[in-house]
Amino acid sequence: HGTAVVVTFDPHPVQILRPGSAPKLLCGPRHQQSVLKQIGIRCLLACPFTPETARTPARDFIQQLVRAAKPLGCISVGYTWSFGHRREGDIHLLMELGQQHDFAVYGVPPLRIHGEIASSTLIREAVSKGDLARAALFLGREYSVFGSVVEGQHLGRQLGFPTANVAVENEQLPPLGVYAVHARAYDDWLPAVANLGRRPTVA
């Protein structure tokens, strides 16, 4: 028994190591917290990723994690997961360190759906093409965007129904267009229409 914690890096390591080829994020930090909460995980640890972090040897990284997370019961990672300077650590080294520091290691096999391995790359590609049904299949949930309402032109007062301008956290978005959506505000879900793109013309 224990508390499940999802550990991630912020910013994405590729943004530090190869800024020009960094992937577009499917979820920002607050969006991640919201999605994890829906599946019962209430703890998200976003570790700062810096050039110094990238130079940390694999063994040192795990030792730092063990010291910071006592008592550490287990670590679950994908079989192809790597860590440490120049990706020198893999699941086999992690298992060795688990024996030394008394924590279990679980290797999670790839998830295959219709013969394809689910991955963030595949999901980003589906979203970029507007194939949100395919994105939802591999996400295990409906594709969603998350953001904060920002000041607009108050067009809702002219149209006779409420509108909201949302500054979204997502970096990977579907093509520009008008979408039928469900909008969540606090605990209420409402049917809505979303315009993704430039400021619409209202006649």
Language model features: what each stretch is:
Residues 1, 152-203:
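Phosphate/ribose-recognition catalytic cores of enzymes acting on nucleotide-derived substrates
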Residues 5-8, 35-40, 68, 140-144, ...:
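A broad, low-specificity signal for short, low-complexity segments enriched in glycine/proline
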Residues 17, 149, 166:
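Short clusters of hydrophobic/aromatic residues that line enzyme substrate/ligand-binding pockets
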Residues 49, 110, 168:
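Active-site donor-binding loop signature of nucleotide-sugar glycosyltransferases
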